[in-house]
Amino acid sequence: MTAICSLFAFSSCGESKDDKIYVITNAFFAPFEYYKGSEIVGVDVDIMNKVGEKLGKKVVIENADFGVIIESVKNGEKYDCGAAGLTVTESRKEQVDFSDAYFTSVQYVIYKADDEGMKAKLKTAADGKTKCVYWSDLAGKTLGVQIDTTGNIYANLEINGEGKEGDPDYYKGELNGTGATVKTYDDAMIAVNAIPSGCDVVVVDQLPATYICSKNTQYECAALYYDENTATEEQYAICVAKGKTELLNAINDVLKELGKDGIDALVKKHLGLEG
């Protein structure tokens, strides 16, 4: 009976959708969202729970494939917002509204710790401390990615380029013509576990990469740069269905209250770096 009430919460069990905030996520993107036992936890979950407290509503977090998050929030039939380490892009902004950005990330590459070929390509970025490899160093490799993520988008862009040669906005791509390919997986950890039989390396955002490598010492990771000064910078935000102004304002209020220090504290908490 409990399971039935959970599935049909909108029409039964005495609670309406107005009493809750339904949040869709993909719970395989630690430290932002991940399973702890049967519970979904993470930075985004902590943020949304604070939003629920502000609005006096219960927050319900549900897991789904990453690729359906934007569309599910856009149609507004069930989910009020999406919190999944979502990168703000122009195409996504056409479909949903985004909160203020709360975290800046770059793309990373994960490889086997005993991959001497990759280790030989390691460099130090212009800041003097960031370990990196260049996109061009991935020539000829099979790049594993989580489907529909920005890692997937960037990998496709660098392999296939954009526009037509001769056009003013033409971009060849760092890996175009090198024999590099993309292989998609349902989540980053599945992709990582496929190294080296299914793919050579995995392209994923910074903190999920460092989290995975901290828990699995047979892998290492490095930032992906174009040259010593230029990385693939992107910003995370929470998305809501267009027109949900009250919810969007509450999310922005919470993000403002947390500030950079508060977000950093949540990140450290879920990376196990507290204390």
Predicted feature residues:
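A ligand-binding cleft/hinge motif common to bilobed small-molecule-binding domains
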Residues: 67-71, 85-95, 154-157, 161-163, ...
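Sec-dependent signal peptide cleavage junction
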Residues: 5-19
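Ligand-binding clefts/hinges and TM-proximal coupling segments of bilobed small-molecule sensing domains
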Residues: 58, 125-140, 145-172, 176-182, ...
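Extracytoplasmic small-molecule ligand-binding "clamshell" domains
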Residues: 17-86, 183-185, 205
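Acidic, polar ligand-binding/catalytic clefts
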Residues: 58-137, 223-231
